[in-house]
């Protein structure tokens, strides 16, 4: 498990309990097949006989406004943190980078930083953003990043070599691959 050695992850650790393992095994007994919607899970299941394959998350594009940037507007950078996954998602790298960006470009940017918001509030809070800081340590973007990309935002997230190969895109063309 990728995590900071000096920090507890009680939210994640519940998935390692005997009770959760028993529940997981029950679900797997009752399922017909496994479908992955994310490249991060694809390698885990790819050799299983009951694995249907990878089907990317669908998104309804007409539900999003593709807001146009106005001239001479400050660049708005949004960083939304789920506190329980702060280290696992690599948010400390973004926080460190934002300190430098704030010092060098405070007159040209606006930062919006939020923590542990419910989904609807989270999505609404980044509406004016130009740049979204999503996560590191990932091969594929998460659903929030996918929705942000659908709105024409620049997203820093997982978009590595396997992402580019799978979706037949050039590196950093639809999302910026973020690695520590």
Features from the language model and the residues they span:
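Short alpha-helical segment that forms part of, or immediately flanks, the ligand-binding pocket
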Residues: 123, 146-150, 164-165, 169
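Membrane-proximal helix-turn-helix segments that form the acceptor-binding/catalytic region
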Residues: 4-34
């Amino acid at each position: 498990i990728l995590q900071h050695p000096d920090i507890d992850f009680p939210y994640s650790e519940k998935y390692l309990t005997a009770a959760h393992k028993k529940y997981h095994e029950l679900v797997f007994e009752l399922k017909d097949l496994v479908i992955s919607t994310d490249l991060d899970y694809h390698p885990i299941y790819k050799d299983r006989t009951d694995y249907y394959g990878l089907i990317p998350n669908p998104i309804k594009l007409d539900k999003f406004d593709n807001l146009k940037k106005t001239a001479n507007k400050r660049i708005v950078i949004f960083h939304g943190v789920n506190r329980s996954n702060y280290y696992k998602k690599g948010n400390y790298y973004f926080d460190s980078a934002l300190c430098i960006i704030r010092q060098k470009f405070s007159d040209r940017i606006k930062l919006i930083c939020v923590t542990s918001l419910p989904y609807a509030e989270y999505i609404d809070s980044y509406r004016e953003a130009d740049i979204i800081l999503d996560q590191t340590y990932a091969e594929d973007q998460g659903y929030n990043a996918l929705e942000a990309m659908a709105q024409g935002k620049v997203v820093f997230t997982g978009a590595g070599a396997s992402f580019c190969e799978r979706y037949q895109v050039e590196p950093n063309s639809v999302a910026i691959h973020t690695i520590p």
